[in-house]
Regions:
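Sec-dependent N-terminal signal peptides of Gram-positive bacterial secreted proteins and lipoproteins
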Residues: 1-21
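Short beta-strand edge/turn micro-motifs at domain boundaries
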Residues: 119-153, 157, 161, 233-267
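Short, cysteine-centered beta-strand-loop-beta hairpins and adjacent loop/turn segments enriched
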Residues: 104-115, 228-236
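Generic hydrophobic secondary-structure signal
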Residues: 1, 5, 57, 61, ...
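Flexible low-complexity loop/turn motifs enriched in small/helix-breaking residues
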Residues: 15-98, 102, 148-231, 252-274
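Residue-level detector of short, conserved catalytic/binding motifs and their immediate flanks
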Residues: 117-119, 222
Length: 274
């Protein structure tokens, strides 16, 4: 999943016109780009044109952008429509710059919900460092977050669970952790089986009323929570034994049946919240 999303995002960036929000300062873009690659400066006649400088700078920042999106969402997301909003020089004559970049993230085949991610990178001869990250979601994102929050609240109340001290992972977050950390693979396999055998057959187009499993783990114990389309709340208690996660207990109780409000392709909530 990780490699595919990186390739898709890079293709999307290359197929969309990259634009600046403000009038360009070619010298700043040129100096910022040269700072990344070399301390050596070249005569003006040998410097590339502005469009090449701009596109090269965006390409150079690609993996820094991708890293910050993963840090925020907890898993890779595709993005497009990159914009450099502006570049400033830290000090007159220095090769230390702040570049403000904005991209649009999306969930499935260019469909909503959309996120607007604005990042500021400090570019110096020592490398690229992120200094700020701001996220702005659309109305659908807000609706999905509220749906997930209401669903999880109903499940927790059914089983009288207080999980504030437990780190949580949505389905895609858990999948990403399994890709980069072998200790999560057996845990993700449990969640994947829930989705494929229980939740996927209940999914309807264009909207569904179920959420994918949300996993809460602390040390070697945890819970996997989900709700069926008829409102049944389900709680899997899991435990790590000999390096593998196993289900030690399954419980279910009738809960609130949710309305069909979530687009069928949404596989997780946007940002983890308790």
């Amino acid at each position: 999943m990780r490699i595919i999303l990186v390739i898709l995002s890079f293709v999307l960036l290359s197929s969309h016109q990259v634009v600046a929000e403000k009038a360009p300062n070619e010298n700043l873009y040129n100096d910022a780009l040269l700072t990344i690659f070399s301390r050596k400066l070249y005569p003006q006649s040998e410097q590339p044109d502005y469009k090449l400088i701009y596109d090269t700078l965006i390409t150079t920042l690609f993996f820094s952008i991708d890293k910050e999106i993963i840090n925020y969402y907890g898993y890779p997301k595709q993005f497009e429509s990159a914009k450099i909003l502006g570049i400033t020089r830290e000090h007159e004559g220095s090769f230390d710059f702040n570049a403000e970049v904005q991209v649009t993230t999306f969930e499935h085949a260019h469909d909503p919900h959309y996120g607007k991610e604005t990042m500021t990178f400090n570019i110096s001869p020592f490398g690229v460092k992120t200094t700020s990250f701001q996220h702005e979601g659309d109305k659908l994102e807000q609706d999905i977050n509220e749906f997930y929050k209401a669903t999880l609240s109903d499940i927790k109340q059914s089983f009288n669970l207080n999980l504030e001290s437990y780190p949580s992972y949505t389905y895609n977050q858990l999948q990403y952790q399994a890709e980069i950390n072998n200790e999560f693979k057996s845990l993700f396999n449990i969640a994947e089986e829930i989705v494929s055998s229980i939740l996927l057959p209940e999914r309807k187009i264009p909207n569904k009323n179920v959420i994918d499993p949300v996993t809460f783990i602390k040390d070697n114990t945890g819970y996997i929570l989900f709700k069926k389309s008829d409102g049944t709340n389900v709680n899997y208690k899991v435990q790590k034994k000999d390096g593998n996660w196993i289900v030690t207990e399954k419980n279910s109780k009738q809960g609130k049946k949710m309305d069909y409000k979530i687009p069928w392709y949404v596989w997780k909530k946007i940002k983890p919240t308790d």
